[in-house]
Amino acid sequence: MIACDAHMHTRFSEDSDASVHSMLDAAVNKGMQAVCITDHLDKDFPETPDFPAGAFMFDLDEYFSRLTQLKTEYQKKLEVRIGVEIGLQPHLGEYYKELTEKYPFDFVIGSIHLIHGQDPYYRGFFEGRSDEEAYHEAFQVAIENLKKINSFDSLGHLDY
């Protein structure tokens, strides 16, 4: 069995303060054979109680440069792959298609972080409707995303 983690966030993601080096060193120390760094890239992510609007965007050229350098540095200790976790929204299909054609990602997670512009992580998403209605809307949006976007390898956060 190959020990691999393919869903890792570093300082490139607004929700992590871990350096890429510290993540790779931890993987080596745990005896892992491979990792794929998949920082959040969520175009049009709105302001939330925890993050400012646009927080989950970063410089992809810098990202590839840094991770490519570390792939070489760690090549005898750990297989390092370059991935990304994109935030699916139906209107972003063409944007993500162009992005994944431009950058040679090893792995792309397509995650459903927003339902009609709202983050279901926060209780406000559920206000004014039953849980059943909220989940129905969430799954309807998931289906819409899957019909309009195919620029990813694995679906993330289907049910948060």
Describe the role of every protein-language-model region.
Residues 67-70, 95-98, 140-148:
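Short, charged beta->alpha transition segments
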Residues 12-14, 86, 102-105, 109-160:
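Domain-core and long-helix interface of multi-subunit machines
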Residues 91-95, 119-122:
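Short, conserved acidic/polar surface loops in the N-terminal third of protein domains
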Residues 1-90, 99-102:
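An N-terminally biased module of ancient metal coordination in phosphate/nucleic-acid-related enzymes
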